[in-house]
Design a protein with these regions (language model features):
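Intrinsically disordered, low-complexity serine/threonine-rich segments
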Residues: 17, 26-28, 347-348
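Bacterial N-terminal signal peptides that target proteins for export
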Residues: 1-8
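Short, charged juxtamembrane terminal tails flanking transmembrane helices
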Residues: 364-369
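Basic polycationic patches enriched in arginine
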Residues: 5, 362-363
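Bacterial Sec-dependent signal peptides at the C-terminal "C-region" and cleavage site
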Residues: 19-24, 360
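Sequence/structural signature of beta-propeller domains
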Residues: 24-339
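A short, hydrophobic C-terminal helix/tail in secreted or cell-surface proteins
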Residues: 342-360
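Bacterial N-terminal signal peptides
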Residues: 10-18
Length: 369
């Protein structure tokens, strides 16, 4: 009888956990003033990000991290108690609201970049007449920093970062800096040293992704740096290892983030509501390994996630909406997002449930029951 009760309890736990993992849902996991850019540490289960917030006292630290298995118990001045702030760089932001970009490798790279180390843009305004823009390097928990890992010659902080995890650009960190009507694309080795890949007139990008080198799945996008431009053009573009740019036509929407769908859990930084939101979107299971884009603007039919793909028949890049945030009761006006594998303790709970069931069956066999 005891074994039967154990089995029933384990079965109920397994069913409840599976239902949670497979259901569509949205939940606020943290409160952060003015979150702008986020990234995700795959081995630590942390969302790491930057903010733009008008309260100048908040800039004693520039970045923050959230353990996604935690939930806020208290919120003070827009900041929940499960947020770890770090950085403490000589930064002071005024004017503009573009925020500081952050990124991290999802795995150890052959070039020497290590998983979960943090690379973040910031502006040193200690000399207000001569601001300087840098990429800072942080160890995974943010307690150690190399503030001047790389210093840009131009102080513009309209910069996007992305790691080449495919090898097209030597498994290096890529930076795309926009200055007066011109974009400069660079690759950085582990010391921060930069090599220019190309410069492009009248181009400004909102997102970067080095597409896996699988021509069957990605067609002419395979192995290329895929980006979306902003402003009047809003085009899909690719750049190859030699810096040659190809324009694939108009998107007509603002794609803030490009990603490969590796799971069905999304972390969304929603700037207007000062929140980090966890979305569970089972529809993404149908697009594992595909390119997806996070669309944020006020144009109909609304913000959401698009599937971006190479159409072999027309030899062109196409996209279709596969999820609308309104279906989750959300209406983000300015945000970025990351999509990740199942990160929470629910996955461990599911595995534990399965192991408990197997242990029960083994004990039953041993006892002849």
């Amino acid at each position: 009888m005891k074994h039967i009760r154990t089995l029933l309890a384990t079965t109920a736990l397994f069913a409840a956990t599976t239902a949670t993992l497979c259901s569509q849902s949205a939940e606020v996991i943290a409160n952060v003033p003015g979150p702008v850019f986020i990234t995700y540490q795959h081995s630590r289960y942390h969302v790491v990000g930057s903010s733009y917030f008008y309260n100048r006292n908040w800039w004693n630290h520039d970045y923050w991290a959230i353990d996604v298995n935690s939930r806020p118990s208290q919120v003070t001045n827009f900041l929940s108690d499960n947020v770890q702030r770090f950085g403490n760089l000589p930064s002071y932001q005024f004017g503009g609201n573009d925020g500081y970009f952050v990124t991290t490798p999802t795995k150890n790279l052959p070039s020497g970049f290590q998983q979960d180390w943090i690379y973040a843009v910031y502006v040193d305004r200690s000399d207000r007449n001569n601001p300087t823009t840098h990429i800072a390097q942080f160890n995974p928990d943010g307690t150690q920093a190399t503030p001047n890992w790389y210093t840009f010659a131009n102080p513009s902080y309209n910069i996007r970062l992305a790691f080449d995890e495919v090898g097209t650009f030597g498994y290096n960190l890529l930076s795309a800096q926009y200055t007066t009507n011109q974009l400069t694309l660079r690759k950085h080795d582990t010391s921060g040293a930069a090599t220019d890949i190309g410069t492009y007139n009248d181009l400004r990008v909102s997102s970067l992704l080095v597409v896996p080198n699988d021509q069957v799945r990605y067609g002419s996008l395979a192995g290329q740096l895929l980006a979306t431009s902003t402003g009047a053009s809003e085009d899909f573009i690719t750049i190859d290892s030699n810096g040659v740019l190809q324009n694939w036509g108009r998107v007509g929407r603002n794609i803030a983030t490009l990603s490969i769908a590796v799971g069905n859990v999304i972390y969304l930084a929603d700037y207007p509501s000062n929140t980090i939101i966890e979305l569970r979107a089972p529809v993404l299971d149908n697009y594992r390994g595909e390119i997806i884009g996070f669309i944020y603007d006020n144009r109909a039919p609304g913000s959401g996630i698009a599937h971006i793909y190479w159409d072999q028949a027309t030899q062109s890049v196409k996209w279709d909406m596969i999820l609308y945030f309104r279906d989750y009761g959300l209406d983000p006006k300015g945000a970025t997002a990351v999509v990740v594998p199942e990160p929470s303790s629910l996955l461990a709970l599911l595995m534990l449930s399965g192991m408990s069931a197997r242990a029960f069956r083994r004990r039953a066999r041993e006892n002849g029951n």
